[in-house]
Amino acid sequence: MQKKIDKKEGKINWSEDAKKIIGKINGLFPTPGAFFTFKGERYKILKAVIGNGLGKVGEVISNNLEVACSKNQSIKILEIQRQGKKPQKISEFVLGSNIKKGSIIINV
């Protein structure tokens, strides 16, 4: 019998490398999903790819929501779902989001 996956296991640890984070996003899609929190709100990452940007771990390094992780790697988020909202392509999401370049999204 398989162990049920707890929602907490979906929390993204930005100090992991990009390949591991992408594996979590893909492996936990569609439920329970991989997520991060920002200013008390949960954001579920639905689709992402490995980027090549540099920055501090957990830092948003582009206006199109690319986030730095360990080993000088990054994750480019392509599709996201804000808590209680419908899924959005990142090009739509960034228009009304308060997550901007320079924001830090470290999960505590």
Regions found by a protein language model. Give the residues of each.
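Acyl-group handling in specialized metabolite and lipid biosynthesis
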Residues: 3-16
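An anion-binding loop in the catalytic cleft
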Residues: 15-108
